[in-house]
Amino acid sequence: MKALLDLFKQVQQEEQFDAIKIGLASPEKIRSWSYGEVKKPETINYRTFKPERDGLFCAKIFGPIKDYECLCGKYKRLKHRGVICEKCGVEVTLAKVRRERMGHIELAAPTAHIWFLKSLPSRLGMVLDMTLRDIERVLYFEAFVVIEPGMTPLKKSQIMSEDDYLAKCDEYGEGEFVAMMGAEGIRELLRGIDIEKQIEQIRAELQATGSEAKIKKFAKRLKVLEAFQRSGIKPEWMILEVLPVLPPELRPLVPLDGGRFATSDLNDLYRRVINRNNRLKRLLELKAPEIIVRNEKRMLQEAVDSLLDNGRRGKAMTGANKRPLKSLAEMIKGKGGRFRQNLLGKRVDYSGRSVIVVGPTLKLHQCGLPKLMALELFKPFIFHKLETMGIATTIKAAKKEVESQTPVVWDILEEVIREHPVMLNRAPTLHRLGIQAFEPVLIEGKAIQLHPLVCAAFNADFDGDQMAVHVPLSLEAQMEARTLMLASNNVLFPANGDPSIVPSQDVVLGLYYTTRDKINGKGEGMTFADISEVIRAYENKEVELASRVNVRITEYELVDKDAEGDARFAPKVTLQATTVGRAILSEILPKGLPFSVLNKPLKKKEISRLINTAFRRCGLRETVIFADKLLQSGFRLATRAGISIAIDDMLVPPAKEKIIAEASAKVKEYDKQYMSGLVTDQERYNNVVDIWGAAGDQVGKAMMEQLQHEDVVDREGKTVKQESFNSIYMMADSGARGSAAQIRQLAGMRGLMAKPDGSIIETPITANFREGLNVLQYFISTHGARKGLADTALKTANSGYLTRRLVDVTQDLVVVEDDCGTSNGVAMKALVEGGEVIEALRDRILGRVTVADVVNPETQETAIEAGTLLDEDLVELIDNIGVDEVKVRTPLSCDTRYGLCAKCYGRDLGRGVLVNSGEAVGVIAAQSIGEPGTQLTMRTFHIGGAASRAAVASSVEAKATGTVRFTATMRYVTNAKGELIVISRSGEALITDDHGRERERHKIPYGATLLVQDGQAIKAGTQLATWDALTRPIVSEYSGTIKFENVEEGVTVAKQMDEVTGLSTLVVIDAKRRTAATKGIRPQVKLLDANGQEVKIPGTDHSVTIGFQVGALITVKDGQQVHVGEVLARIPTESQKTRDITGGLPRVAELFEARSPKDAAVLAEVTGTTSFGKDTKGKQRLVITDLDGNAHEFLIAKEKQVLVHDGQVVNKGEMIVEGPADPHDILRLKGIEELAHYIVDEVQDVYRLQGVKINDKHIEVIVRQMLRRVQIVDVGDTKFIPGEQVERSELLDENDRVIAEGKRPATYENLLLGITKASLSTDSFISAASFQETTRVLTEAAIMGKTDDLRGLKENVIVGRLIPAGTGLAYHRARKAREASERERAQAIAEEEQSLFIEPPVVQATTEGEGDNV
C-alpha cells in the first residue's frame, strides 16, 4: 500500500521554478540525457509491429509500449515496477516515459549546427571572424582551412582550395602545417579561440579606431564573445558530435487501416541521418579513398541540416509525395507551430458552442442555456450530486442515470447551475468585453439566448452568429468570473469609459418616439396631479403620447450618505411642462436623477449620456436595473408606436431639378474655359468634382429640410412648422438606423462615385434609389460598392495583425505599485485645429492624476491639489474657472521599473475608479487600439461606394471676436494692387481675447492674400485670408525685370500644347527625364534692376534666384517687368482622391512601427540663425549658426520647399524643410514629451475621422513600450558596450549599482523602436520567440545563455503558470516572499551550525531554476 501512495506522491510533485535558461548543450550533456544510442534506421517490425531493437522506436532505449509490461511479455503488472527484463532489456514502467526519454546518435564526423551557421548574422562567422561564404566552403568540403600554420608564412584560418593545398604541401613539405576540411576543421578553429584574449584585443581596438563601420563590427563581435564568456558556453559546442533523438511518442508512427502507416516527417529525417552515419562509419573502417569519405561526410552534414531546419540551405529534402519534410525548426515556428498552436492557443474542455438568439426577457446578468448543453457541460457536478444524494452509488451508475435523462436529473441540474456563472465568448475576441460571465437560465431549444444590451460589447447580431460557452470549474474561478467578469459588472468600455450597455435600434426608436412632442396633440395643455392620472388618461385615449401637458412629478434629491454609506434621498414635487410619454417613462428613473435628464427627445447619444450620468451618480447596481427597465420600455413602446416605412416616406425635394440644372450649366462653363485654354485639364477636373460635390450637398440639405419639418395647425389655428413624424426621418434622427448620408442616397441624389483606386469619377449619379438608376448609373455604382466588399475581406487580416503586434509589445506592462513618486508629467491643453476645439480640455484630463496644483487664474488660489484624481466634478470645476492647461501624470514618465504605477495611469476606464494593482493595462491598451481597427477602413470612406471628400478650404475666417496677431514667422509683401501677399511658409495668425488669452490660431499658407492687419480688432466671422486651393503659386519677393536661366525648351522645360485648346504653356520637366549632361542644371529666374544689374538679397551679395519646381507652369515671359508679390508660376495640386492616401489602418501601423517617412522634413539640429551658403549642383546649402558661433550645414535638394528665410532665428527641432515629420528626429531634438504628443495626435486624427473614441492614455502606454530601450553613449564603469541597446530598466539598475560603489554611471540616449522591433528585442526570449522570427531569437538566446525571468504574461502562459496580473500578481508575490523567507531560514540554520563548530551538512543552495540548461 505504501508503495502505491508513494507512486501518487511522485506524480503530484510539481516543479517550482523562477526562471528558464536556454543554452547550448555540450556533447556530454546530450549523452547524459540519452537512454541509449540509436544505431539502426529501422522503426518497427512489419510483421509483429513491435519496435526494432536499437532502432528509432526501440523499447530498450525509450521505454515500454504498454504500461508496466516489458516487450517480450516476461514481466507484467505493477509488482515488477522498475525491473529491467534480462531477455529484451526493457525497463518495466509507465508507457508515457516514451514521451520524455531521449536517445542519441554518435556522429562519425562532427557536423555544424545549421542555425548557428545560416541564421543571420552568422554566429559562427562572428566568432571566427570569417565570412559565411568561406565557412560554407570549408563545411561542405570545397576548401581547406589552415588550423596550425607552424613555421610557414600561412595565416591561421586562411582558406585554400584543394589544388592550393597540394601545391603548398609540396612547397613546405607535409606535416609542416595543419589544414583541414569540413566541420572538424571549424571545430578545431573554435577550440583554439582564447575568448579572454580576444575580448581584450577587441576592447583595445575599439578604443583605437574612429571609423563608425569598424566600431559597429567590433561591438557586434564583442557582444557575442562576451556572451560566451559570461554564460560559460564553449564555442565548439556549435559543432555537433552527438545528435539527440526526440522521444518516439513526440514523432509517432500510427498504423492506418489497410496496413499503411502514417508517420511524422521527423522519422524520415532521422532515418536519413542514421543511414548516412552508418555508411560513413563503414567507409572509415574500410579506409575508403579520401574523396568517397568526403562525399559521405558532406551528405551527413546535409542530412543533419535538413533534420534541424529543412530548406534553410540548398533544396529542401522531400518525402515520397514530393513535398518538403517538416523539420524540427518548422515544428516550433509560425501559426501552426508549438508556440502559437499548442502553448498560447490551447483548446479547453467543459465548453460548447451554439447559435445565439435574442433573449428580451433576460436580466442583464443572465443568459439562456439550452438544457441539453447544460446537461453535458455540468456532468461532473451532476454526478457528484447524484452520489451525495445516494441516488447513484458509482460514477457508472450516475452516468447511466444522466444518459436516461430522468426527471430527477433535471431537478439536480437546476440546483447545480444556480449561481454558477458560465462564460460566453464571441469570436473574434477583440477586447476584454468579448468574454463575459452570465448566470445561466435553462431553456428549451438548442440556441443560446443573449441579452440584447451586451450585443454592442460582443459586436454580436442575430443573423446566425455563434457563441461559445465555458464553465469555470474551481471555486476561485467561479468567484473571479462572478466578481470581475459578470456582464452587470462590465458596463463601461475600457477604451474610452463610455457605457457599453447602451440600447440600439428598435429600443432607441421606441424611447425616441415616446419622448417626442407634438403641436396640438389630443389633450394638449391638460394638467395632471400625478403620473398614475396621466396613465389613466392615456389608457382611456384622452391624450396622445406626444401631447404637451403639465404634470406634478416627484424627484428624489441626494441629501447625504448614512453610516453604512447608503444614500439618503429627499422627495421634491414640482409641476413640470412635459409630454405624456416622458411623464410615463419617468417612473423608471432611479432615485438621485432629476427629471430634466428625461425631459427631452431621447436620441441614441442622449440615452448614452443618460446611462453615463446614472452610473456616475447612482452607482453600478442602480444603473444596471435602470438599463434593463429602459430596454423593456423601449421594446414595448416601439411595438406600440407601429412605425413602418413606405416608398412615399422618401420625399424627393422639388428643388432638386433646379440645383442639378445649375450645376450642369457651371460644368459646361468650365468646359468652355478649358477649350479656350484659360484652365488646364487638371484644374477643370478639380472644379467639376467640386461643383458636383456642392450640388450633392445642396440636394441633400434641401431634402433634409423637407423631411425634417412638416406644417401643422396649432390650437390658435395658425399654421406652424414642427419636427416631422416621417418614419425615415425619425429613424435617422434618433440614431436607431441609417444616417443623413444614406437617406440622401434614397431620396436626394447618389452623388459622386469613387473608382477602386480612390479617384473620383467626374460624372455623378443624379438619380436616387427612389427614382431608380439607369444602366450606366448602376454600372458606375458597382465600381465602388464591390471595392468596399473586397476591402473588408482584406483589411480584417491586417487589423488582426496590428492587434497582435500591439499585444505583443505591451503584454508585460502591469500596474505593480500604487505610486512611483515622480514629479514629471505632461501639460494638457484643449486640442484646437483651425480655430475649432476638437477635443475639450475636460475630456483630455478626465480620469488623470494632477502633478502640480491647479491654480485659479482669477484669484491665484489653489483650486485642486497635486496628486488628485480628476473626476467629472473636478473637470467641471476646472472648466468653470477657466484654466487653459493642466499638468497631469502620464504612463510615459512613470518611474516604476518593471511595470507602471496606479497614479501615473489614472482611472481604469472600464471600472470608473483609480486603477487596481495587477491590472494588465498594456493588454487593455493594445485591445483598445486594435479593436476598432477593423472599422478603420482602408481609405474607403464610401457609403456603398459613394465618394466623400474633404471640401477644399480656400479661405480662413475667425470663429471668435478679438484681436489679430501674427506670429514671428509670418512674412508678407504688398503687391501692386495694394494686397498683402504671404511669403512665409510657416506663418500663423492668432486671435486673442480682451485678456490676451489665445482663442484660436490659423496657419496661413504661402501665396495667400491677407485681408487683415496685425493688431486689428475683428468680429467673429471675418475672413482673415484667401488663396487658390487648386494651385500653389511661386511669388516674387522683389520687383525687377525677369531674366530666365536654364529655361531651355526640351531640356528643362517642355512646351505643353493642349490638343483641345491649341494653346501652349511652359512646364518644368523632371530632371530624371533629362540626359546626364543636363541633369545638374535647374530652371530659375534672376531679377535685373533698371541698370540691368542682378538684384541682390538685401544685406548680402547673393543674387535673388527663384527656382522652379518640377511640374510648375511658368506664367511670366523672359524680359517681363514684375512687381513685388506677383505670381511667377503655379504648381497644380494633385487631383483629389477620396480622402487621405495613408489614411486608416496603414497610417496607424506606420506610426506605431516608427517608420521614417520618405522625403521627411528636415528639423533644425540647433538653435541659431539661418543663412544660405553657396549652392552646389542640385542642392542648396543652408547654414545654421548657433549661439556659440558654430556653423551647422544642411544640404537640401533644390526641389524641396525651404520654410525659413535668410536671417531667421530658428529653435532646435523647428521644421526648416517641408515634409512629413520623422518621429526619430522629434525624439532626438525635442524629447519624449513632444514625441508622445506627435504620435498621440496623429493616431487620434485617424480614429477621430471614423468617429472612434479612444483615450489618449492607451496610446501613451504603447509609446512607453516603444521607448523602453536606450542606446549607450558613454559606458562609464558599467558592464555595457558603447552603442549597445539595452532595456531601460536594466540600465537604471546597473547605474544604481555603479553609483552605489562610487563609480561613473553610463550615459545614454533614448531610442524609439517600432512595435515589431520592440517585441523582438524584449528581454524575454520566450515571448520574442513566440512572436516572430523564432529561429533567430532562439539562436541568439542560446548563444547568450539567456535567462528568462518570466516577468510578462506571455511567458507565464507558455510555461503554464498563473499570469503575474490580476489575482495572479498576489499569488506570485506571496510565493516569492515565501521562498525568500525559506532561504533566509536555511541560511540562519547554516550559520548557527557553523558557530557550533559542527561540520555542517551540505546544504544545496541552488534555488529553483538554476543548474542545468533547459
Swiss-Prot record:
The UniProt record lists the EC number as: 2.7.7.6
Ligand binding (Mg(2+)): D461, D463, D465
Q: Which cofactor does it need?
A: Mg(2+); Zn(2+)
Record-stated family: Belongs to the RNA polymerase beta' chain family.
Highest taxon listed in the record's lineage: Bacteria
Q: Which InterPro entries match?
A: DNA-dir_RpoC_beta_prime, DNA-dir_RpoC_beta_prime_bact, RNA_pol_asu, RNA_pol_N, RNA_pol_Rpb1_1, RNA_pol_Rpb1_3, RNA_pol_Rpb1_3_sf, RNA_pol_Rpb1_4
Q: List the source organism.
A: Cupriavidus taiwanensis (strain DSM 17343 / BCRC 17206 / CCUG 44338 / CIP 107171 / LMG 19424 / R1)
- What this chain does, per the record? DNA-dependent RNA polymerase catalyzes the transcription of DNA into RNA using the four ribonucleoside triphosphates as substrates.
Q: What class of enzyme is it?
A: transferase
Q: Keyword Hydrolase on this protein?
A: no
Give the catalytic activity: RNA(n) + a ribonucleoside 5'-triphosphate = RNA(n+1) + diphosphate
Naming one, the record's GO cellular component terms include: DNA-directed RNA polymerase complex
Classification via Pfam families = RNA_pol_Rpb1_1, RNA_pol_Rpb1_2, RNA_pol_Rpb1_3, RNA_pol_Rpb1_4, RNA_pol_Rpb1_5
| Name of the gene encoding the protein in the UniProt record | rpoC
Binding residues for Zn(2+) 1: C70, C72, C85, C88
Question: A single GO BP annotation from the record?
Answer: DNA-templated transcription
**Name the UniProt record assigns to this protein:** DNA-directed RNA polymerase subunit beta'
Q: Whom does it interact with, and what assembly results? A: The RNAP catalytic core consists of 2 alpha, 1 beta, 1 beta' and 1 omega subunit. When a sigma factor is associated with the core the holoenzyme is formed, which can initiate transcription.
Establish whether keyword Transferase is in the entry.
Answer: yes
Residues that hold Zn(2+) 2 according to the record:
C820, C894, C901, C904
Q: Name one GO molecular function term.
A: DNA-directed RNA polymerase activity
Cofactor binding remark:
Binds 1 Mg(2+) ion per subunit. Binds 2 Zn(2+) ions per subunit.
Question: Which residues are listed as membrane-spanning?
Answer: none
Q: Which UniProt keywords apply?
A: DNA-directed RNA polymerase, Magnesium, Metal-binding, Nucleotidyltransferase, Transcription, Transferase, Zinc
